[in-house]
């Protein structure tokens, strides 16, 4: 089940990242400004703000199997429709559609893990699951300009190709995802259909620990989406070819895969997880600043550190939510919906502000300062976490 969920999360990462390496040809073909392109790359995050919470509740009621199937189908449609865009409005709408299917996947896969795994296994499984999205992003960034675009001939055909790949993955889940392993305890498999939900949402809203993690999540999405969506263009303006810029950005994502796998395991060795989160935020801010100001070896070091420390935040925050007594497997969909709904405010603002500040100042450096300042400032929130967290 973890491997099937990984494939769907791979499709998720592939689809949402595919626009980033194609920014230049899309802007030229459709006549878009940097502000418009920033709005496009942040469109699905904007929809997340309104869709994630109700979809999280639906996932708790509908179950993981149907939810992940619907999510995989919708994000594949989002990719296909991007190829038909003739202007800003059409491209914005097709990317925004991802904000309907995306939550079904990004909330559904953690719920899948919370049902199938317990204890330390959840940390490892969350890291592996997160690597699916990261590998999808890495493939989109590393292969789009160097292999896929030359093969299919046009940026529109790239989106068609990735959409068909997504539909293929949805078909695999349709055929195999509904058959739980006989080694899985029945009470765990059935828990998704027999939840006790009285007063759940009201109790969740009163939990201070959940809100602190949500605030940190806002900045994670701000930095992650803001940097990943614009890094290829930043590197191109520093003199890299589109293919090399894609390779470099995929290297950041590969570093993020390692961070997602290593840091959650390391986290269990420490009594104070807030120290882990504070370290991730501080180093991420430094790395982002180095990317904006550095050249040569320093630039490469910044790319590697930004990927490792920024990406590692996601599984750490997810595991902390899972392990809260008020959450667990039973209410992970509801809490995940809250996390993504509010967190994706940052997911929209990151890409949008990077594009807007580029138009205003004619430099990406102002956007880099914005991301760095927000990341560093959020370390204050870690002080409010309970010491046992």
Segments (PLM) and residue ranges:
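Extracytoplasmic gate region of multi-pass secondary transporters
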Residues: 19-20, 208-250, 256-260
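Residue-level signature of mid-helix packing/kink "hotspots" within the transmembrane helices
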Residues: 17, 45-53, 138, 253-261, ...
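Helix-loop-helix hairpin linking two adjacent transmembrane segments in secondary transporters
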Residues: 129-178
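Conserved MFS/SLC helix-loop-helix module at the cytosolic interface between two early adjacent transmembrane helices
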Residues: 50-88
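C-terminal transmembrane helical hairpin of 12-TM major facilitator-type secondary transporters
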Residues: 273-320
């Amino acid at each position: 089940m973890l491997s099937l969920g990984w494939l769907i999360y791979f499709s998720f990462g592939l689809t949402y990242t595919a626009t980033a390496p194609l920014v230049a040809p899309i802007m030229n073909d459709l006549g878009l400004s940097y502000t418009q392109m920033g709005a496009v790359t942040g469109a699905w995050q904007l929809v997340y703000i309104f869709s994630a919470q109700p979809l999280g509740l639906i996932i708790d009621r509908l179950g993981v199997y149907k939810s992940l199937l619907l999510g995989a189908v919708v994000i594949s449609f989002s990719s296909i429709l991007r190829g038909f865009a003739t202007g800003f409005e059409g491209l914005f709408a097709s990317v925004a559609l991802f904000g309907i299917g995306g939550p079904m996947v990004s909330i559904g896969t953690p719920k899948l893990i919370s049902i199938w795994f317990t204890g330390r296994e959840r940390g490892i499984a969350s890291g592996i699951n997160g690597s699916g999205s990261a590998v999808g992003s890495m493939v989109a960034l590393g292969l789009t300009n160097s292999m896929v675009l030359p093969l299919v001939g046009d940026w529109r055909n790239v989106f068609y190709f990735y959409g068909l790949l997504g539909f293929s993955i949805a078909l695999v889940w349709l055929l195999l995802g509904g058959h739980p392993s006989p080694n899985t305890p029945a009470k765990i498999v059935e828990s998704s259909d027999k939840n006790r939900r009285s007063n759940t949402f009201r109790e969740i809203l009163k939990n201070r620990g959940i809100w602190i993690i949500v605030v940190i999540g806002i900045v994670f999405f701000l930095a992650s989406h803001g940097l990943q969506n614009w890094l290829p263009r930043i590197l191109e303006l520093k003199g890299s070819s589109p293919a090399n810029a894609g390779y470099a950005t995929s290297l950041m994502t590969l570093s993020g895969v390692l961070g997602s796998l290593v840091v959650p395991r390391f986290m269990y060795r420490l009594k104070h997880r807030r120290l882990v989160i504070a370290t991730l935020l501080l180093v991420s801010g430094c790395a982002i600043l180095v990317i904006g100001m550095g050249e040569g070896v320093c630039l490469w070091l910044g790319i590697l550190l930004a990927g490792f420390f920024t990406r590692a935040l996601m599984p750490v925050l997810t595991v902390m939510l899972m392990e809260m007594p008020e959450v667990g497997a039973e209410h992970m969909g509801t809490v995940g919906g809250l996390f993504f709904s509010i967190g994706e405010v940052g997911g929209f603002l990151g890409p949008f502000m990077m594009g807007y500040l580029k138009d205003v100042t004619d430099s990406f450096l102002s956007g880099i300062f914005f991301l760095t300042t927000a990341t560093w400032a959020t370390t204050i929130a870690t002080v409010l976490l309970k010491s046992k967290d």
